[in-house]
Amino acid sequence: MSEREVLQKINSPEGKEDRIIGKHVFGNLYDIDAERLNDKEFLEKLVLEAVDIAHMKLVEIKAWSFGGKKGGVSVIALVEESHIALHTWNEYNYATLDVYTCGEDSDPQSAFAHIVNALNPKRYQMFYADRSSQ
């Protein structure tokens, strides 16, 4: 099959059903209020809101608190489309955020933006990776 034929197949309605659409938004959040970063219930609620905002379907959510110097909270939402993972280090006023979705209907950028806006870091980095099969 020529390159042109492959592109025609991928862009056809049938071809779109045959390929995987992967959108991965991830980043680092700096200088966040430490109290928010240690509030497991707040962070879990925040991730649940992000799931809804991004039009994802929740399968399960788990949250854990960790003590010690490098302690914080981890919240993982397993969604039908993939996942949202938020990890915090309260003593460092730092968090990492990972939003990965498969399919055309979900919007990982809106989930990422919602969490960033709620945590209100003084600065953050956001990265995007296209993880589609074609």
Curated annotation (Swiss-Prot):
SUPFAM superfamilies: S-adenosylmethionine decarboxylase
Keyword annotations: Autocatalytic cleavage, Decarboxylase, Lyase, Polyamine biosynthesis, Pyruvate, Schiff base, Zymogen
Cofactor(s) it depends on: pyruvate
Domain of life assignment: Archaea
Pyruvic acid (Ser) modified-residue sites: 82
CC terms in the record's Gene Ontology section: cytosol
A Pfam family per the record: AdoMet_dc
Active site: 82 (schiff-base intermediate with substrate), 87 (proton acceptor), 102 (proton donor)
The EC number(s) this enzyme carries: 4.1.1.19
Co-factor binding details: Binds 1 pyruvoyl group covalently per subunit.
Keyword Lyase: yes
Transcription regulation as UniProt keyword: no
Activity regulation statement: Highly competitively inhibited by L-argininamide and L-arginine methyl ester. Also inhibited by alpha-difluoromethylarginine. Is not stimulated by potassium chloride as observed for other decarboxylases.
UniProt-listed InterPro entries: AdoMetDC_fam_prok, ArgDC, S-AdoMet_deCO2ase_core, S-AdoMet_deCOase_pro-enz
GO biological process, one term: polyamine biosynthetic process
Subunit annotation: Heterooctamer of four alpha and four beta chains arranged as a tetramer of alpha/beta heterodimers.
Name of the protein: Arginine decarboxylase proenzyme
Taxonomic lineage of the native organism: Archaea, Thermoproteota, Thermoprotei, Sulfolobales, Sulfolobaceae
